[in-house]
UniProtKB/Swiss-Prot annotation:
Gene it is expressed from: yqiD
Taxonomic source organism: Escherichia coli (strain K12)
Name recorded for this polypeptide: Protein YqiD
Induction (record text): Expressed approximately equally in exponential and stationary phases (at protein level).
GO annotation, cellular component aspect: plasma membrane
Domain of life: Bacteria
Keywords: Cell inner membrane, Cell membrane, Membrane, Transmembrane, Transmembrane helix
Amino acid sequence: MFIAWYWIVLIALVVVGYFLHLKRYCRAFRQDRDALLEARNKYLNSTREETAEKVE
């Protein structure tokens, strides 16, 4: 079965575009996750300090 050259080019462009989209999306997701984790850690540390002050 003959596949026209433009179908091969189209499939290659879709694959490359999908790869670049995933790369960008994963980077943004990682930055969001790191920011949320940092905020959570700050909150937990401040809560621990307040609890330690109340106990003393």
